[in-house]
């Protein structure tokens, strides 16, 4: 009808009129007041600037009817067009799954004239498009509200059961509700959103209530002899299902649980619980009483859901957390020579055994009575795990610094002398670590010479004289370099940590002479410089001055020395020993600084050395620590093993790492 209409196309009709099949909604895109007609297939797309600005009224955007009231340029898309262009109404109905726009546009001749200067000032097109893949609403985002309402019809199975009280018989009552129900055993279920059963006829109310299977008329049902099983798939013995969020029961009163089933009343097939006395005793899950719930994920004999307690550790290795306390896993004191691999969790706070002996090592066993710096080895003397008292010692998190003995002020600060100092007082029970200098050097340089040692401790850098007893393996290492020995440790004054040694390098500088340590210390961890033998000499290993003659000492793994730990024994310097021999990564007794366990790697060798028995509080021979993590000399650790055998701590890491 284009030719019959006085339509002035903005362009010549050959170009302006588009022939083609009807357009789906996706062919129109509206941008910048331009109607972009995407012609399907071979059709030509015309862009006409709409002279009439399209004013969109977002009227029905929300109800899946997009009403575009606009002075839209009269774009006429091919369709059955019976209307002239000036007052056409394009109604596109969103038929589900139909993406065809039925335009009552003029031009049955398959010519759609696009009136660019269209007179269609007040043209309203109602587009109801059936979920087109792309629908362009002018300034109105397509809002397809598909409201699907699902009416839940619970699948209720009624199990015919004898009436709980005589005189109540359930007749087959026709369902009186919107829904239809399935009934078994002569019960009719009314599947309604709400319903109540009078005499088995639903009373269509917001909640079902049963008196004696009669309605109790309440929003929450109470049942005299009926029990509601309010759950999605309930099975009711006596009464029809009462599906509500809460119920109170006359005889069989469920205690208002979301999951309850009642034994006398009816077993409800649920994952919840059944109750013998009709009172649910366990909210969560369980079976109760004599009736077993039809479908139950858990059943408990006594109506009590299993109470989840903290797991008890069978394998004695408590979970790692900051402060575990182990009741039975650990022997209360070290005396029991071994414990079941009780590896305490690694923690940064030191833990102190409550049995910490007064200053001075306990005799006979290496009790870790000092702060256990961060790591307890699972050693035969399982330290008694008492809730660690917070000691000022702060242990930095474990950082594998196997190679270096960098001076870390933090260590000095955070790690008190773990070893008993020369002072006679061992750590008090309070387990306060003895105050030690905050600098790693200071802590490191406890060089009190242990008197009791049969062999003189090499306080000065002079090579330590051979001790009467062979030191544990001298950790033979490459010849000690002629490093100037640090000044002898004449006194227990803390000495700065010697520079990090590489394994390759002998430990030329003496390790800080620490007071004789009762505990052999694992050989120096593999530091870039090999340390002279860190044979755990109970004697202070004041100067790791590498002896010129690196004679490999026999490795008496225990490295135990008779000396008491009373003095803050510095971990024996690698050079110290009857014949300190520098060695690279040689296995030997390594002493670890407990304070540095986290950061240290094996100093000298990977031997696990057995703590030496010290007369005063010797480490038990069973204490085996992995030397790999042991620190070599306390000297470079910056901490003396004050109050504790270094051996006890040395290599403690092995247990955890």
UniProtKB/Swiss-Prot annotation:
Compositional bias segments (type: Pro residues): 449-493, 517-530, 539-561
InterPro entries in alphabetical order: Keratinocyte_PR (IPR052881)
Compositionally biased spans, kind Low complexity? 292-302
Subcellular localization, as worded in the UniProt entry: Cytoplasm
Give the GO biological process terms.
Answer: desmosome organization; epidermis development; establishment of skin barrier; inflammatory response; skin development
- GO cellular component term of the entry, any: cytoplasm
Q: Which residues carry this modification: Phosphoserine?
A: 442
Annotated stretches, region: Disordered: 285-320, 425-493, 517-568
Which stretches are tagged as biased composition: Basic and acidic residues? 434-444
The signal peptide here is none
Name of the protein in question: Keratinocyte proline-rich protein
């Amino acid at each position: 009808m284009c030719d019959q209409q006085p339509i002035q196309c903005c362009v010549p009709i050959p170009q302006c009129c588009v022939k083609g099949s009807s357009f789906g909604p996706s062919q129109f895109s509206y941008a910048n007041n331009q109607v972009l007609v995407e012609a399907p297939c071979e059709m030509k797309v015309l862009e006409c600037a709409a002279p009439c600005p399209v004013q969109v009224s977002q009227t029905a955007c929300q109800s899946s009817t997009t009403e575009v009231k606009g002075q839209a340029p009269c774009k006429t898309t091919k369709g059955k067009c019976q209307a002239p262009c000036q007052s056409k109404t394009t109604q596109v109905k969103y038929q589900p799954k139909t993406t065809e726009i039925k335009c009552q546009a003029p031009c049955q001749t398959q010519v759609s004239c696009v009136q660019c200067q269209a007179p269609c000032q007040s043209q309203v097109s109602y587009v109801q498009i059936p979920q087109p893949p792309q629908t362009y609403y002018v300034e109105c985002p397509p809002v397809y509200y598909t409201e699907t309402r699902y009416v839940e019809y619970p699948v209720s199975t009624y199990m015919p059961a004898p009436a709980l009280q005589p005189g109540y018989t359930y007749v087959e009552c026709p369902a009186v509700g919107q829904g239809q129900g399935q009934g078994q055993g002569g019960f009719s279920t009314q599947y309604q959103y709400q319903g109540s059963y009078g005499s088995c006829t639903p009373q269509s109310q917001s909640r079902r209530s049963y008196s004696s299977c009669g309605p109790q008329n309440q929003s929450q049902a109470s049942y005299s002899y009926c029990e509601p099983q309010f759950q999605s798939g309930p099975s009711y013995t006596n009464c029809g299902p009462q599906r509500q969020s809460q119920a109170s029961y006359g005889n069989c009163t469920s205690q208002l649980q979301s999951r309850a089933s009642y034994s006398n009343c009816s077993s409800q097939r649920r994952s919840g619980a059944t109750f013998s006395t009709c009172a649910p005793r366990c909210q969560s899950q369980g079976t109760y009483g004599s009736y077993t719930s039809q479908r139950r994920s858990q059943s408990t004999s006594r109506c009590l859901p299993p109470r989840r307690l903290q797991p008890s550790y069978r394998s004695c290795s408590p979970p790692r957390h900051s402060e575990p306390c182990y009741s039975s896993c650990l022997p209360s004191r070290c005396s029991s020579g071994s414990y079941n691999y009780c590896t305490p969790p690694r923690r940064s706070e030191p833990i102190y055994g409550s049995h910490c002996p007064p200053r001075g090592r306990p005799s006979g066993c290496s009790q870790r009575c000092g702060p256990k710096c961060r790591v307890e080895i699972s050693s035969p003397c399982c330290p008694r795990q008492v809730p660690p008292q917070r000691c000022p010692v702060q242990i930095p998190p474990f950082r594998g610094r196997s190679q270096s003995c960098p001076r870390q002020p933090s260590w000095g600060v955070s790690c008190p002398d773990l070893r008993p100092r020369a002072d006679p007082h061992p750590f008090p029970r309070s387990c306060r670590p003895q105050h030690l200098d905050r600098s790693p050097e200071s802590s490191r340089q406890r060089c009190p010479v242990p008197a009791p040692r049969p062999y003189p401790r090499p306080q000065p850098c002079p090579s330590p004289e051979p001790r009467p007893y062979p030191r544990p393996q001298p950790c033979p290492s490459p010849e000690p370099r002629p490093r100037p020995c640090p000044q002898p440790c004449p006194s227990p004054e803390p000495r700065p940590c010697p520079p990090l040694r590489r394994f390759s390098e002998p430990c030329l500088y003496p390790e800080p002479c620490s007071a004789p340590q009762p505990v052999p210390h694992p050989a120096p961890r593999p530091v870039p410089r090999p340390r002279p033998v860190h044979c755990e000499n109970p004697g202070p290993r004041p100067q790791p001055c590498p002896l010129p003659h690196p004679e490999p000492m026999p490795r008496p793994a225990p490295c135990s020395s008779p000396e008491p730990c009373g003095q803050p024994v510095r971990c024996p310097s690698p050079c110290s020993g009857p014949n300190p021999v520098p060695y690279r990564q040689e296995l030997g007794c390594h002493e670890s600084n407990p304070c540095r366990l986290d950061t240290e790697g094996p100093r000298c060798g990977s031997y696990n050395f057995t703590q030496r028995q010290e007369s005063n509080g010797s480490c038990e021979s069973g204490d085996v620590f992995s030397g790999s993590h042991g620190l070599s000399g306390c000297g470079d650790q910056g901490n003396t093993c004050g109050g504790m055998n270094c051996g006890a701590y040395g290599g403690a890491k092995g247990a955890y790492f």
